[in-house]
Amino acid sequence: MFSRWSRWSPVMAGVLCVMASVSVVAAGPTCPPTLAPPTQDEIHAAVRGARDHGALWTIEKDGHESWLYGTIHVGNLAMSMPGPKLVRALAAADALAIEVDVTNPVVAQAIRAPRDSSEGPAVPPALLERLKALAEKACVPWEPFSKLPPMLTVAALTALEARWDGLDPSYGTEFVLAGFAQARKMPIVSLESAGVQRKALSGGPPDRQLAAVERVTAALEQGHMRPAVRALARAWQDGDLVTIADYEQWSGSASSPEAKADVERMVFSRNPDLAAAIDLTHREGKRVFAATGILHMVGDGGLPKLLQKLGYKVQRVSFGGEGDERPDPDPAPG
């Protein structure tokens, strides 16, 4: 079976827009914990204890510098608070560039729009009932999911499952970065359209989509998603690109030709356009802080390598933690 969490994490930026419209039912004894809005004291404590997480690069071309950052789409208050080096980079930037602008109501509406006939097959009744049961287990209403492409539905349910381990989509890095940008009145640039985000999930033959939905549904029912999410969160916190690049291992699943084709379509095939969009914003003279899901950063087709091929001097920023002491599988020397 194909790697579970890695299948969905690259497109979770769109899922964040879906989650913004989902009202969580009041938590009961059988519901996953819900994260209450932090108090001012909790925020101040998180700021004082903030450390840098993820992976950050400087990218330099045409005499000025921008930044490239690998994000995660679930988190908690401590994980989400930018550390000192991230704050300095953000403060020096002229614009924030993310996969899609999760704060833009037009973008959010496009992500949540009902699927059309080209966006995924109809879900068989028995599988539909299982998806509804998963939404009930997550203590969220089914209605926001009912008209979405089925693969976007299981991606959102996967993100909700992480709440059992104290990881919540509302603390996804994109929301935190966007909040920082809004507070500074910094422009937010979408690197790709909502349509591209949806196509990343809803493309592929209908029978393969249904097979994928069935596999992820079964994994959610059996509790197999949580260990993979925890492993990804640990690797992201440590900036451990070696582990992240080996997603087939930490996801606990074997690979297959079909799975590899899906990863190529959902992640790496998008990277050239993402790199071109970052390059365009940088060439406009802006110092851009560009952030995408961290799986976009690994391998020969990762964004650091692609930007280097576009003429950038690309250098990993050391956070001085454990993750920086490990060999980087994607060195992009300047």
Q: Which sequence ranges carry the predicted segments?
A:
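Short, well-ordered alpha-helical scaffold segments within catalytic/effector domains
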Residues: 8, 83, 271-275
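Bacterial N-terminal signal peptides that target proteins for export
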Residues: 2-12
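N-terminal signal peptide c-region/cleavage motif recognized by signal peptidases
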Residues: 21-23
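C-terminal soluble interaction/assembly domains
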Residues: 264-334
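Short hydrophobic "helix-edge" motifs at membrane interfaces and signal-peptide entry regions
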Residues: 13, 60-63, 283-284
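Structured, acidic catalytic/metal-binding patches in enzyme active sites
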Residues: 28-266
